Structures are given as structure tokens and as C-alpha cells.
């Protein structure tokens, strides 16, 4: 459950480290696979994404439990997102950590192919 003012880790190598959600698109609460508008709160130096930059991101992990249709529930240790461009492609070239299978259903195939593990 991601809402405005929620801090998220960045799960790619785009240069940002922490994001703060400022808007969830088309919903009140964001879940895995939802696109958010966020502001970069921490960033690495000498990288293309700078601190205080407003970016679009897709949620890939949430600490809130997800109940799947087959009865299985899944929960991650942190809230994480991958920064994307207007077309929905990731701005980084690598994705760190596991991601949920729900991204495949939402047509974020490029992120799924970059991920080391899909749960």
C-alpha cells in the first residue's frame, strides 16, 4: 500500500536511491504494478537522475501482504520501485532484488526480463 508521502527504495541502477511518492496514478492507494509520480530524495553523485527531480516509477515490491487468486499470499521486506520513462521502459539498465509476478500481467516485460528473480 503506497500513498502520497511514502518513501520507497529504488530497485535499479538509475542513480536515485530513495523516492517519495507524491501521486498514485488512477488510484488512491498504490499496489504492485501501479505507476506513481515521485520525487528523488537521495541520489548518487555524477548520475543522470538528480536529487529533487520528479520522476515516474512503477512499484515492484511492497511490505503490505498481497493476496493472490490461487490463495497464496506474498510480502516483501521493503517498498521498492523502478524508475520508468513516459513509454514505460526502465531508465536504468539493471534491476536489483526480486519482483512480483503481477508486473508481467501489467505488461512491464522489460522490467521482468531484467529482474534476477520473479516471485
UniProtKB/Swiss-Prot annotation:
NCBIfam families: rplN_bact. The lineage of its organism: Eukaryota, Viridiplantae, Chlorophyta, Mamiellophyceae, Mamiellales. One of its GO terms (cellular component) is cytosolic large ribosomal subunit. Binds to 23S rRNA. One of its GO terms (biological process) is translation. SMART domains: Ribosomal_L14 (SM01374). Belongs to the universal ribosomal protein uL14 family. The keyword Ribosomal protein applies. Transmembrane segments: none annotated. The gene is rpl14. GO terms for molecular function: large ribosomal subunit rRNA binding; structural constituent of ribosome. Part of the 50S ribosomal subunit. The keyword Mitochondrion does not apply. Keywords: Chloroplast, Plastid, Ribonucleoprotein, Ribosomal protein, RNA-binding, rRNA-binding. It is found in: Plastid, Chloroplast. Its main location: plastid. This is Large ribosomal subunit protein uL14c. PROSITE patterns: RIBOSOMAL_L14.
Amino acid at each position: 500500500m503506497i500513498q502520497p508521502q511514502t518513501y520507497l527504495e529504488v530497485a535499479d541502477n538509475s542513480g536515485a536511491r530513495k523516492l517519495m511518492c507524491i501521486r498514485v496514478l488512477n488510484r488512491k492507494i498504490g499496489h504492485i504494478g501501479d505507476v506513481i509520480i515521485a520525487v528523488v530524495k537521495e541520489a548518487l553523485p555524477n548520475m543522470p537522475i538528480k536529487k529533487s527531480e520528479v520522476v515516474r516509477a512503477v512499484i515492484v515490491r511492497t511490505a503490505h501482504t498481497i493476496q493472490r487468486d490461487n490463495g497464496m499470499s506474498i510480502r516483501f521486506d521493503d517498498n521498492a520501485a523502478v524508475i520508468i520513462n513516459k513509454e514505460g521502459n526502465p531508465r536504468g539498465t539493471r534491476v536489483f532484488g526480486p519482483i512480483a509476478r503481477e508486473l508481467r500481467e501489467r505488461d512491464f516485460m522489460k522490467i521482468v526480463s531484467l529482474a534476477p528473480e520473479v516471485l
